[in-house]
């Protein structure tokens, strides 16, 4: 998880504060999350936040850190998933800028099958309906 965030930063895909990662441990009611407020280029295993899923959701961290503010999205994706074990949620700076500029990213990546096949950008990003309180 930490290496994924560090590599995304190293490649220039994110700034130090963009994105989060979660992993659900197989056959366990446990999800590990990257913490809130920690620079992604220095995050380490000791900083990860553990979310125990039971009748109540409980968080714990060796360094007393809070989970990502988007923990609920990670939980909703992973709680009943049978094949998905991880969520990588990043906000690439260049993609965000291009979307705000009105570029049609879906059409732009078609000539690049390695991007088109495996990456979702713009309006073709699968989305979860808004959460209601």
Residue ranges, per PLM feature:
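Glycine-rich flexible loops
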Residues: 1-133
């Amino acid at each position: 998880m930490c290496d994924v965030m560090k590599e995304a930063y190293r490649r220039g895909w994110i700034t130090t504060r963009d994105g989060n990662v979660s992993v659900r441990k197989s056959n366990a009611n446990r999800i590990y999350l990257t913490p809130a407020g920690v620079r992604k280029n220095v995050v380490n295993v000791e900083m990860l936040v553990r979310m125990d899923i039971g009748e109540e959701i409980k968080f714990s961290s060796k360094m007393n850190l809070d989970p990502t503010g988007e923990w609920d999205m990670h939980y909703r994706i992973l709680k009943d998933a049978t094949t998905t074990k991880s969520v990588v949620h990043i906000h690439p700076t260049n993609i965000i800028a291009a979307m705000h500029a009105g570029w049609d990213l879906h059409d732009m990546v078609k000539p690049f099958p390695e991007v088109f096949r495996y990456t979702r950008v713009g309006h073709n990003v699968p989305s979860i309906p808004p959460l209601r309180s």
